[in-house]
Amino acid sequence: MENIWLEAQTNLKQVLTEQTYSTWIDPLKFLGATVDTIVLEVPSSFFQKWVTDKYLAMIKEAISAVNGKSYQIEFHVADEKPEAAPEEKPEKEGKPAREKEKDKDKEKEKDREKEKDKKELVPNLNPKYTFESFVSGPSNQFAYAASQAVANKPATNYNPLFIYGGVGLGKTHLVNAIGNHILAKNPKAKICYYSSEKFMNEMINSLRYKKMDEFRNKFRKMDLLLIDDIQFMAGKEATQEEFFHTFNALYESHKQIVVTSDKFPKDIPGLEERLRSRFEWGLIADIQPPGVETKVAILKKKSDMHAVNLPDDVALFLAEGANSNIRELEGMLIRLEAFASLTGQEITLSMAREVMKDIIVEKTRDITVEMIQKTVAEHFRIKVSELKSDKRIKTLVVPRQIAIYICRELTKASYPEIGEKFGGKDHSTIIHSVKKIEKQMAGDDEFKASVEDIRKKLFT
């Protein structure tokens, strides 16, 4: 039976990322099996809950794929004996039945407290957000390095760590990566990841139901507190008051605090001065919008994770057309992947332009036929008048056809309108030119790169 589990692990390794597999599957140990149940050992109760919630169905499928049989999975926590029926002890003579009931009630209360503690220890991290899946570049290198330093040695040099930057630049990814890294090293670590809004809502509910002591104890016993979008606490005096005392309690206990915001602490209106000063005690790291090269790397990383073939020219097209928001990039990639999957087509540059025409519109609507003619003429060192002429020599025909192709791709001009701009040529000549360039680009990578180089010049 152990061989079945080993084969199932091999199956899981092929479908999960290396980080996910090493964190959540590799630590599972085969203990034994019955006819229809496989018993696995887990490092901790939290680990058991996380694997049960996130990966149990996948584990069952992987096991079933080995021999076609379905098994139940039973987890045993390491260093904990499997639950057995309580040993019957001789009762002390004359112990009243009422006292026995009280003892039972006390045991039940202890069990409830244990369950409550388990729930509080669930960190709410996104397992997909790891350092391995984060693409670092010049725009985020400082924040990335600082986050790794905190994850490797929490509550030492950089406490608190304050990460700020615009929407969709990777702040949430980094704070989750810190939590996942620490949790992988120490599954028993008490980690809490909250948005500031969730912190505030939970505090309000605790006030309403008179459970503030529980609320405070929950946060102040953490080893790592991760708070996302702290700017939403601005102007909320009661929430800031409570967070201030939570911050102090954790800091004095040498526990790590990581906070994110869309602004530098001093630029957050409505944030109390005492909180600002606390944030400045540690390290403040910013994330800037990524450049084109970093955006291309992000797209390639995401496509590899999804097992999708994304050609370099398509990645460049998306990177140049998107704003600097990484979420927008991901949305474009998902849209392109979905279209390719549903239509059964390979992803190509022409497909990307068609699928993204309503998204990447701002980058193209200001491009005119005249701009394209001028750029192509300069690239080939010829005159615009020669480009528009009827001369049939090769040194003019190819540049002319390239210019016509780019006009069709980047402007809203019709075939007749383009023909008019090129010395009154008829629409059939324009169509022929477009098809000619498309065919040559499909079979000649060097030629294709030359055309793309001209396109780039139009956006710089």
Swiss-Prot record:
InterPro entries: AAA+_ATPase, Chromosome_initiator_DnaA, Chromosome_initiator_DnaA-like, Chromosome_initiator_DnaA_CS, DnaA_C, DnaA_dom, DnaA_N_dom, DnaA_N_sf. Residues 78-121 have a biased composition (Basic and acidic residues). Residues 78-122 are annotated as: Disordered. Residues 341-460 are annotated as: Domain IV, binds dsDNA. Keywords: ATP-binding, Cytoplasm, DNA replication, DNA-binding, Lipid-binding, Nucleotide-binding. GO terms for cellular component: cytoplasm; plasma membrane. It comes from the Bacteria. SMART domains: AAA (SM00382), Bac_DnaA_C (SM00760). ATP binds at G168, G170, K171, T172. Oligomerizes as a right-handed, spiral filament on DNA at oriC. Plays an essential role in the initiation and regulation of chromosomal replication. ATP-DnaA binds to the origin of replication (oriC) to initiate formation of the DNA replication initiation complex once per cell cycle. Binds the DnaA box (a 9 base pair repeat at the origin) and separates the double-stranded (ds)DNA. Forms a right-handed helical filament on oriC DNA; dsDNA binds to the exterior of the filament while single-stranded (ss)DNA is stabiized in the filament's interior. Domain I is involved in oligomerization and binding regulators, domain II is flexibile and of varying length in different bacteria, domain III forms the AAA+ region, while domain IV binds dsDNA. This is Chromosomal replication initiator protein DnaA. It comes from Geobacter sp. (strain M21). The lineage of its organism: Bacteria, Pseudomonadati, Thermodesulfobacteriota, Desulfuromonadia, Geobacterales.
